[in-house]
Amino acid sequence: MKIATLAVVSAFAATAIAGPIRPDGVVNDKFLIELGPGETQWVTKQQKHEMRAHINSIYKAGQGFVDITDEFGTDFTTAEVVPANYPKSALHAAVVNPMIAGLSKENLMRDLNTLVKFNNRYYESPTGVESATWVFNEVQKIIQASGVKGAKVEKFTNKFKQFSVIATIPGASKNTVIVGAHQDSINLKDPMKGRAPGADDNGSGSVVVLEAFRNVLKSKAIQAANATNTLEFHWYAGEEGGLLGSNNIFKKYKADGRKVKAMLNQDLTGFTKKGNPEQFGLITDNTNAELNEFCKTIVEKYATIKIIEAKCGYACSDHASAHRNGFPSSFIAETNFRNTNPYLHTADDVIANLDFNHMLEHAKVVVGFMGELAMTPNL
């Protein structure tokens, strides 16, 4: 998760440029980042990390970024939003409720305990590759146990070491519904070797998506191949470096003409601040308003806690990759960000700080989102 303040961005204002034009003397240790539509600048990797370090300060809607170095010299343009027709109410409780009944807090605990044992899940470290491999193997086991025909898992490779994981459940149409979470973590003091359990950021979102996937595959409707739309479950590499993995995926989907009708992001799903009401935070900036309304419907139908609107700034997480490539996206987080987890990006982002009941509520929302849209005709 990335929430940097405007003050940090202004510290690098002297190097800002109007567009992606490589200045004289810029070499391979500089990276082109996008701070907003059409607003770019060249920074070092250390500067990228420094921009992120302020996530632990009191939250205010700040300036995230997308690393678009690989887009330099291309004709990238923001695509028109893929049109979609979302239901005004939840219509498939008969499909979704059995999925919810199968959700297991014990599974969430077990899977998260595995993820936090990696020294870190940094996208350029050996253990970052090992953690991605664990996710891939676990998804493969779940598919094999389900017996669902056509379900598959793939590695989406990048120019950096860590790969993303994509699981697909085919539907009758090519219209695609996606839920995603980044599985990388970072210790900002020592990204490559530092301890970064990343329990909340974003082991919590990763295991929520994994548990949702497990129970969607157990659905009788899914096993009978009755889904109207294709479902994908994503675990992204390199979010902490500037949405690297997710942006690579959605750029390819745009180039391939994919019909992604909805994308739900799960980043930070486990922290609740004592003394504050338990709630979801629905991010309203750089997301799709119509899909956000559908998300409210899902929360009201299938979860037991309230949802409030919040903002997180440009490119704060992977939903922004879908959004900038023309795909409708939403982001439901653990809080409104004023009460965000104070331990993010440190060695202290550990399981002891998390609430698995809250994570279970996120899992209910994910299976509600995926189950309802799986069965929606003319999406």
From Swiss-Prot:
Cited Gene3D superfamilies: Zn peptidases
Q: How is the cofactor bound?
A: Binds 2 Zn(2+) ions per subunit.
Any one annotated GO CC term = extracellular region
Write out the annotated subcellular location: Secreted
Q: Which residues are glycosylated?
A: N202, N226
Binding residue positions for Zn(2+) 2: D201, E240, H345
- What is the first-listed, main subcellular location in coarse terms? secreted
Disulfide bridge partners, by residue number? C312-C316
Q: Name one GO biological process term.
A: proteolysis
Record-linked SUPFAM superfamilies: Zn-dependent exopeptidases
Specify the domain of life of the species encoding this protein: Eukaryota
The signal peptide here is 1-18
Family named by the database record: Belongs to the peptidase M28 family. M28E subfamily.
Query: What protein does this entry describe?
Result: Probable leucine aminopeptidase ARB_01443
Give the originating organism: Arthroderma benhamiae (strain ATCC MYA-4681 / CBS 112371)
Q: Specify the taxonomic lineage.
A: Eukaryota, Fungi, Dikarya, Ascomycota, Pezizomycotina
